[in-house]
From Swiss-Prot:
Role noted for this protein: Tyrosine-protein kinase that acts as a cell-surface receptor for fibroblast growth factors and plays an essential role in the regulation of embryonic development, cell proliferation, differentiation and migration. Required for normal mesoderm patterning and normal skeletogenesis. Phosphorylates PLCG1, FRS2, GAB1 and SHB. Ligand binding leads to the activation of several signaling cascades. Activation of PLCG1 leads to the production of the cellular signaling molecules diacylglycerol and inositol-1,4,5-trisphosphate.
PTM per Swiss-Prot/TrEMBL: Autophosphorylated. Binding of FGF family members together with heparan sulfate proteoglycan or heparin promotes receptor dimerization and autophosphorylation on tyrosine residues. Autophosphorylation occurs in trans between the two FGFR molecules present in the dimer and proceeds in a highly ordered manner. Phosphotyrosine residues provide docking sites for interacting proteins and so are crucial for FGFR1 function and its regulation. Ubiquitinated. FGFR1 is rapidly ubiquitinated after autophosphorylation, leading to internalization and degradation.
PANTHER family per the UniProt record, alphabetical: FIBROBLAST GROWTH FACTOR RECEPTOR 1 (PTHR24416:SF131), TYROSINE-PROTEIN KINASE RECEPTOR (PTHR24416)
Disulfide cross-links: 54-100, 174-226, 273-337
A Pfam family annotated for this UniProt entry: ig
Extracellular side: 21-371
Ig-like C2-type domain: residues covered: 25-118, 154-242, 251-353
Active site residues according to the UniProt entry: 617
Keyword Glycoprotein set for record: yes
Principal place of residence: membrane
Cleaved signal peptide residues: 1-20
Name of this protein: Fibroblast growth factor receptor 1
TM helices/strands, residue ranges: 372-393
């Protein structure tokens, strides 16, 4: 306790000392009093999205954007929204000086941004400061007498072990000279290092004696030996590379931040909060407030108010600083920085003290030494008070933890969700103990049911989403999901303006043998859907029943099932099902219909990406279709345990959709928006084969080898070359070279606008062609519908499709 308190105290005192020592910022005398100019550099890579923001002052009356002295206007790549400008798919033509001119009543502010878009990816450039030195040494060596190779900078090669996190760029250098000029080659683990040994290859810069590997993964671990040789001799040097895989954890907040702050009335207070998180964090700033004269509710948890929360256009750097302008005495109090990700929640608090404006009489001015002493003592007093308060609070409430309900403007602070169930008391005890409180915690990967007979639990009520149970009429079951079952239902009065309107909905609920982990996952999915918000092309949360009974999560109902079965049910007669060859679909799909499906899914994924949500299981089976043929992405809020699943065994915890997974996700478990783009490419292939199974006839073990060798699925018969190129772009080996969902939306929107409604599909050709032919080792039972490498058994409703090879029927 003493050690932790000392660290906090030193953090506060150091921050105070720095603030005292910092000189005031003033403009040079030669700058006109009515104009202020700031210059900010901005670097980007080709294909990036450039976002420039103008920091607004309170007295700003108008904003103008200028590039190289010319007024900027919106184009198909440039979007201007007041204080912000966005340029998509950046290129060298976007280089220049951008000026944001804001006019106020007393002065004009001009912010200059010098934008530089490089001509090549940074990984292809070598910016080593020793390049020129190496070149000059080589020239000097060429003019000298013949000699064997020698290291030119051995002191820079002393560090042999390099431990770097995954996805970083690694560069090894072996600078040498000799006459004649030596040659350079590299070994990995004492064997020749070939380009095809790693996804994306590597680069050798002979002129700088360097080896460059972009986006390293755990499989890149090993010993790398450079051999420099000429006809007079050879030398070598070995580096050891250790790639540290990033383990998921809740956000880590820098110790001592935010720090206690003291300001005078009318000035600006600033709190900083440095957040470290591998999964994308969601950051909020909260202020502790009083309700009915009390800062603490009856259950012992304090009340808080949300001051600042992350939005679509806010960066993490913006969220790490809280500015309180023109502070008053009412602003004094406790402030909290809250950071949450998919793993958990962390928070730090600090106090704001508001002081009176000091009299300007010289006799009353404190010396710098006195001011430092006052700040140190004040900081020590507040830290001591805070530590004592925490100790007393924990002694009185040993079993309670803290968490934040981030969706309420004023709400209680709680760390985990209390779940109440009946408890049997044995013996003759007369205690009134008829219920116990169970805290929902993450279980081990076994997921053993812990709440058998769960009948009642208690969650904080959210008025924005709460639906009365008597307004919900449950109907027939629709199926079983990850957490329990899904049933059809009718909800009355979901639309507040139409209290008697009946809406058909789907309701997710727990099974009778639900575990604590199941409950935690269902609550996490519900909270994720609240946080992400609503969009036309995702399954939206409509409400929830959290009080006086089991948890019901109410979502939109989709009458036409998932996209995979939707497409298969609309195959033309030329692709008849083996069990019903006379079946004729009610509706034939045109080329434009299929492009529309892809366009809608891309729009939904673009929205999820803007909310910093990574799906990790995008496939046609997870896209649902409404009565009006609207595509809606489902299961984006599921908590998936992807780090403890054996790739070669079916487990009770889950199944990996390997046929839809990007190589970096499959081999190194790196999940990003770019890995979702790979899955979207497979979904495109599913759409244009009307629900075909990816990589048909390819065994899972062979699939891994094919992906590493760069093989990709062939173009579907009724797919245009442009759309097939889009698929192949999504399947690029380098994640950074894949298109973004925003770019995919723009391209599909253009293709959709040029499509004709009359282009009905001729699917007399096979849909399951794939260039590497493999014998079908399975029985004649149809099994083309496998969702993952674990499933080799046919689905009960799977249609048996004819097997083709090179345009002809393939013998079984």
């Amino acid at each position: 306790m003493f050690s932790g308190m000392s660290l906090l105290l030193w953090g506060v005192l150091l921050g105070a000392a720095l603030s005292v020592a910092r000189p005031p910022s003033t403009l040079p005398d030669e700058v006109a009093p009515k104009t202020k100019t700031e210059v900010e550099p901005y670097s980007a890579q080709p294909g990036d999205r450039i976002t420039l923001q103008c920091r607004l002052r309170e007295d700003v009356q108008s904003i103008n954007w200028v590039k190289n002295g010319v007024q900027l206007s919106e184009t198909n790549r440039t979007r201007i929204t007041g204080e912000e400008i966005q340029i998509s798919n950046a290129g060298p033509e976007d280089n220049g000086v951008y000026a944001c001119v804001t006019n106020g009543p007393s002065r004009t502010y001009t912010v200059l941004c010098s934008v530089n878009v490089s001509d090549a990816l940074p990984s292809a450039e070598d910016d080593d400061e020793d390049d020129d030195n190496s070149s000059s040494e080589e020239k000097a060596a060429e003019n000298s007498k013949p000699n064997r190779p020698l290291w030119s900078h051995p002191e820079k090669m002393e560090k042999k072990l390099h431990a770097v996190p995954a996805a970083k760029t690694v560069k090894f250098r072996c600078p040498a000279n000799g006459t004649p000029t030596p040659t350079l080659r590299w070994l990995k683990n004492n064997r020749a290092f070939q380009q095809d040994q790693r996804i994306g290859g590597y680069k050798v810069r002979s002129q700088t004696w360097s080896l460059i590997m972009d986006s390293v993964v755990p499989s890149d671990k090993g010993n790398y030996t450079c051999i420099v040789e000429n006809k007079y001799g050879a030398i070598n040097h070995t580096y050891q590379l250790d790639v540290v895989e990033r383990s998921p954890h809740r956000p880590i907040l820098q110790a001592g931040l935010p720090a206690n702050t003291s300001v005078t009335v009318g000035t600006t207070a600033e709190f900083s909060c440095k957040v470290y998180s591998d999964p994308q964090p969601h950051i909020q700033w909260l202020r502790h407030i009083e309700i009915n004269g009390s800062r603490v509710a009856s259950d012992g948890f304090p009340y808080v108010e949300i001051l600042k929360t992350a939005g679509v256009n806010t960066s993490d750097k913006d969220m790490e600083v809280l500015h309180l302008r023109n502070v008053t005495f009412e602003d004094a109090g406790q402030y909290t920085c809250l950071a949450a990700n998919s793993i958990g929640i962390s928070h730090h608090s600090a106090w704001l003290t508001v002081l009176k404006v000091e009299d300007n009489k010289p006799a009353l001015l404190a010396s710098p030494l006195q001011l430092e002493i006052i700040i140190y003592c004040t900081g020590a007093a507040f830290v001591s008070a805070m530590v004592v308060t925490i100790i007393i609070f924990k002694m009185k409430h040993p079993s309670k933890k803290s968490d934040f309900n981030s969706q309420l403007a004023v709400h209680k602070l709680a760390k985990s969700i209390p779940v109440r169930r009946q408890v049997t008391v044995s013996g003759d005890s007369s205690s009134s103990m008829n219920s116990g409180v169970i805290l929902v915690r993450r279980l081990s990967s076994s997921g053993t049911p812990m709440l058998s007979g769960l009948s009642e639990y208690e969650l904080p009520e959210d008025p924005r989403w709460e639906v009365a149970r008597d307004r919900l009429i449950l109907g027939k079951p629709l199926g079983e999901g990850c957490f329990g079952q899904v049933v059809m239902a009718e909800a009355i009065g979901l639309d507040k303006e139409k209290p008697n309107k009946v809406t058909k909905v789907a309701v997710k609920m727990l099974k009778s043998d639900a575990s604590e982990k199941d409950l935690s996952d269902l609550i996490s999915e519900m909270e994720m859907m609240k946080m992400i918000g609503k969009h036309k092309n995702i399954i939206n949360l409509l409400g929830a029943c959290t009080q006086d009974g089991p948890l019901y999560v109410i979502v939109e109902y989709t009458s036409k099932g998932n996209l995979r079965e939707y497409l298969r049910a609309r195959r033309p007669p030329a692709m008849e099902y083996c069990y019903n060859p006379t079946c004729v679909p009610d509706q034939l799909l045109s080329f434009k219909d299929l492009v529309s499906c892809a366009y809608q899914v891309a729009r939904g994924m673009d929205y999820l990406a803007s909310k910093k949500c990574i799906h990790r299981d995008l496939a046609a089976r997870n896209v649902l279709v409404t009565e009006d043929n609207i595509m809606k992405i489902a299961d984006f809020g599921l908590a998936r345990d992807i780090h403890h699943i054996d790739y070669y065994k079916k487990t009770t915890n889950g199944r990996l959709p390997v046929k839809w997974m990007a190589p970096e996700a499959l081999f190194d478990r790196i999940y990003t928006h770019q890995s979702d783009v790979w899955s979207f490419g497979v979904l495109l292939w599913e759409i244009f084969t009307l629900g075909g199974s990816p990589y048909p006839g390819v065994p899972m073990e062979e699939l891994f080898k094919l992906l590493k060798e760069g093989h990709r699925m062939d173009k579907p018969t009724n797919c245009t070359n442009e759309l097939y190129m889009m698929m192949k772009d999504c399947w690029h080996a380098m994640p950074s070279q894949r298109p973004t969902f925003n770019q995919l939306v723009e391209d599909l929107d253009r293709i959709l606008a040029l499509s004709s409604n009359q282009e009905y599909l001729d699917l007399s050709m096979p849909v399951n062609q794939y260039s590497p032919c493999f014998p079908d080792t399975r029985s004649s039972t149809c099994s083309s519908g496998e969702d993952s490498m674990f499933s080799h058994d046919p689905l009960p409703d799977e249609p048996c499709l004819p097997k083709y090879s090179n345009g002809g029927l393939k013998k079984r």
